[in-house]
């Protein structure tokens, strides 16, 4: 058992723009975060992950960076950031920030130089190609829809942008680019931050030749992930990144590893040779797609997570999560945010949280915050949502249907303001919020839930305390039980003589639990989300909709 401080943390993700506004301009800021640090400490948080607060024109909410060493005015100043770092450390917590190094903003000085002429010294810092006649260099589709190429009239060439056109991709084959990035990374680490969550890092290597995608359907642009996501040769860049930066400091690093399978994860998170301490994998998120009437596949979900648990056992470490700033709210997608909001928020929380790995909570998840239903596309801010909506309208879909699709798929679902109280704008701001507050804020907020012992918030406090209370829930071996059950996700965590059994019915119907190998007693029940009658030596019983239980067996 290889103990590390970062394996024992409880982490919390903050989306600064929506967390807390301190000056009434309707935008969350650094001083607002400082004002809520005691809330996070009381919750049981050890590590804060801060989404981008760098200088940015904000075409993609800060993931388009124009200056890596300065703070966006609406968030505050570098002095504010230094104060935040100090206040976090004063409370015994740690702070990591987003590191966005696949691309910059089109307003970054590097790109301004690069686009100025074909013979500029920084031309090769980005990826430029001539078009094919009047068309783009290839048929790749941007992750944010449309072409992945944008024409620059000044130099009459196209530049590659896997995300928005305002986010040109850096050329990682250029050593000068890599060296400048390493200097910037070490500058932040010398400032005293405790690490990074590294954004879109699996996209930094592009397939040689930038060839067209196969296009049997005759599409204008084709989804191109296989040409730029975890492609052959990326390990060279990852190894150098670690050697030049991370390995010199006692920090924690989390890679956003889209496209990395459990079988390939060794290169990314192996204890000694991996680039990162842990990674965010997205296989479990890919199980959900918007289709009317499509239910949540419990068995597929537990199969994916169990595969990751087993593949990294004794080799690497998992970063556990069910929500972040890029996906809709879990209770509204996988669960039932109407009849069983509280129950399913607790059930999904318990099942992921007590697996082996470092759990991350996204702001508002601990309250059971839900998706939002705006009345018009004009109320949305997310560039991906707006682009997708416009594409759907152009394809002949009605405005009503396109808007309903946005209700369930938009990234803005997780970016609505944090719900602190029942007062105006959920206590987030005394001004006009930059994006609309969810209408259910008077029922779902910190103030209300702190007073309710059965709230989702107080359940998360118990969950955090439980995770920290026994090493078996941190370092213990994970074993799935009831493998073929299509409704119940259940597993054990075992270390020496300590053993826990965690179970949840992840459906809105009753589910029969049957497992003869463990006889369960009510005296050993340590966490639950329904009232449970006294029982002794039970091996079968009924779990109510979204019921979860945790037993300490020994």
Identify the residue ranges that each predicted region occupies:
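Acidic/aromatic-lined carbohydrate-recognition and catalytic surfaces
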Residues: 2-186, 190, 203-261, 271, ...
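C-terminal beta-strand-rich structural cap/linker in extracellular carbohydrate-active enzymes
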Residues: 536-554
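Loop/helix patches that line or flank the sugar-binding groove of alpha-linked glycan CAZymes
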Residues: 5-6, 213-218, 222-226, 236-238, ...
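Beta-strand-rich binding/interaction modules
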Residues: 510-530
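Short catalytic/ligand-binding loop motif for oxyanion handling, primarily in non-cytosolic enzymes
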Residues: 23, 56-60, 103-110, 204-207, ...
């Amino acid at each position: 058992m290889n103990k590390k401080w970062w394996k024992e943390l409880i982490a919390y993700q903050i989306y600064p723009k929506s967390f807390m506004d301190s000056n009434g301009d309707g935008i969350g800021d650094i001083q607002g975060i400082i004002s809520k640090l005691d809330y996070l400490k009381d919750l049981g948080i050890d590590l804060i992950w801060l989404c981008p607060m760098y200088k940015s024109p904000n075409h993609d909410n800060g993931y388009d960076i124009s200056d890596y060493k300065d703070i966006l005015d609406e968030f505050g100043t570098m002095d504010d950031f230094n104060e935040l770092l100090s206040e976090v450390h004063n409370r015994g917590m740690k702070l990591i920030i987003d590191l966005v190094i696949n691309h910059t903003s089109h307003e970054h000085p590097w790109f301004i130089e690069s686009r100025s002429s074909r013979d500029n010294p920084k031309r090769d810092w980005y990826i430029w190609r001539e078009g094919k006649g009047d068309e783009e260099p290839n048929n790749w589709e941007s992750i944010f829809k449309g072409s992945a190429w944008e024409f620059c009239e000044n130099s009459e060439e196209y530049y590659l942008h896997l995300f928005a056109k305002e986010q040109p991709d850096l050329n990682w084959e250029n050593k000068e680019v890599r060296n400048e990035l390493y200097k910037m990374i070490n500058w932040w680490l010398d400032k005293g931050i405790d690490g990074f969550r590294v954004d879109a890092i699996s996209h930094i290597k592009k397939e040689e030749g930038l060839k067209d995608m196969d296009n049997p359907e005759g599409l204008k642009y084709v989804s191109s992930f296989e040409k730029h996501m975890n492609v052959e040769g990326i390990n060279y860049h990852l190894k150098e990144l670690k050697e030049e930066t991370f390995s010199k400091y006692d920090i924690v690093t989390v890679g956003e590893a889209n496209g990395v399978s459990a079988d390939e994860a060794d290169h990314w998170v192996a204890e000694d040779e991996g680039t990162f301490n842990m990674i965010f994998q997205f296989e479990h998120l890919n199980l959900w797609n918007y289709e009317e009437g499509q239910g949540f596949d419990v068995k597929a979900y537990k199969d994916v997570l169990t595969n990751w648990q087993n593949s990294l056992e004794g080799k690497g470490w998992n970063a556990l999560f069910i929500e972040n700033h890029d996906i809709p709210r879990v209770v509204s997608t996988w669960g039932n945010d109407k009849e069983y909001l509280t129950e399913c928020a607790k059930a999904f929380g318990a099942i992921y949280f007590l697996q082996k790995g470092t759990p991350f909570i996204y702001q508002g998840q601990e309250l059971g915050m839900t998706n939002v239903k705006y009345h018009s596309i004009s109320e949305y801010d997310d560039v991906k949502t707006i682009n997708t909506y416009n594409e759907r309208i152009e394809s002949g879909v009605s405005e009503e249907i396109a808007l309903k699709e946005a209700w369930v798929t938009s990234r803005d679902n997780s970016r609505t303001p944090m719900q602190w109280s029942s007062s105006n704008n959920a206590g987030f701001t005394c001004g006009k919020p930059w994006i609309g507050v969810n209408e259910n804020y008077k029922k779902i907020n910190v103030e209300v839930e702190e007073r309710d012992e059965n709230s989702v918030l107080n359940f998360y406090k118990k969950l955090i305390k439980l995770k920290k209370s026994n090493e078996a829930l941190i370092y213990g071996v994970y074993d799935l039980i009831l493998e073929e059950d299509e409704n119940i996700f259940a597993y054990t965590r075992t270390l020496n003589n300590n053993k826990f059994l965690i179970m949840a019915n992840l459906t809105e119907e009753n589910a029969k639990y049957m497992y003869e190998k463990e006889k369960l007693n009510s005296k050993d029940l340590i966490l639950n989300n329904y009232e449970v009658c006294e029982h002794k030596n039970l091996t079968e019983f009924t779990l109510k909709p979204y019921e979860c239980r945790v037993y300490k067996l020994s």
